[in-house]
């Protein structure tokens, strides 16, 4: 069984136009999370915490996955795409060589909650054309196994006799993103490839990880060892909900400057120059 090697408490942060959020991971020593770069959780019942949204801004060199649990968020980009994310919808955006987009709330009150995950691209694909796709929540596969369920956003894994296949296939890294809900007393074992990075973010309730049953409470990211199955147990009296992220590390240099993630300082400088010259997105 995989074991917990590190646990990180999500930290309060602010991004965009004053949007309050939790930075789950990102920044220092990014190789720990390879091929993932950053995970944010945003969520509030107070409109002033999210109403400013994320006005137009650039990206280059990676992909973003936005997963809405509750609320309404509108995407617009330089390619003319417009999409509205509602409860349980998912957006997968490939920045590639460059995209300029905004993410703005389309509500003035009520609950907004969700996640944004950054997934790295290999050097060979960092300058590929930008792409964007919105997926209604009802189109994301959900697999029910008695006392737990798996919403398969990306990747695939076999649980028992069932092939759990996510909506998105990510050939560069075999990236997996699963939203798992565990009823009290349930146990799930995920047979991951030994070479894969594996991360567990408990966003509601509490679980225990591995044979040692290391506690993983709400707003905690657990980074696991790279061998054996990933075992998650809900020993509590309430439902637990968590994101499981797994993927093959790229093992390439990671150089990040704000919204740009490349392999060298020179490439970052070029991205900044391209953006300032108005040619980032071609």
Task: Tell what function each PLM region has.
Residues 1-282:
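Jelly-roll (double-stranded beta-helix
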């Amino acid at each position: 069984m995989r074991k917990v090697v590190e646990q990180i408490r999500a930290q309060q942060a602010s991004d965009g136009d004053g949007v309050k959020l939790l930075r789950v991971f990102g920044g220092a020593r990014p190789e720990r999370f390879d091929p993932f770069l950053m995970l944010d959780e945003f969520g509030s019942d107070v409109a002033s915490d999210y109403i400013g949204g994320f006005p137009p801004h650039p990206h280059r060199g990676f992909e973003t996955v936005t997963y809405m649990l509750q609320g309404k968020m509108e995407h617009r980009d330089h390619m003319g795409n417009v999409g509205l994310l509602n409860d349980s919808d998912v957006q997968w955006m490939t920045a590639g060589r460059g995209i300029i987009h905004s993410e703005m709330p389309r509500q003035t009150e009520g609950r907004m909650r969700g996640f944004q995950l950054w997934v790295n691209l290999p050097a060979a694909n960092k300058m590929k054309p930008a792409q964007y796709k919105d997926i209604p929540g009802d189109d994301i596969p959900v697999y029910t196994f008695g006392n737990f369920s798996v919403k398969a956003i990306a990747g695939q894994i076999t649980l028992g006799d069932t092939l759990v296949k996510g909506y998105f296939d990510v050939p560069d890294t075999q990236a997996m993103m699963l939203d798992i809900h565990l009823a009290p007393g349930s146990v799930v074992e995920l047979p991951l490839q030994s070479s894969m990075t594996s991360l567990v973010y408990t966003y509601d309730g509490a679980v225990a990880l591995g044979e040692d049953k290391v506690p993983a409470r709400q707003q905690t990211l657990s980074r696991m060892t790279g061998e054996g199955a990933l075992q998650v147990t809900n020993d509590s009296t309430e439902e637990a909900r968590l994101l499981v992220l797994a993927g093959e590390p790229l093992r390439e240099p990671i150089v990040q400057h704000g919204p740009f993630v490349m392999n060298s300082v020179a490439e970052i400088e070029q991205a900044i120059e391209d953006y300032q010259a108005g040619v980032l997105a071609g």
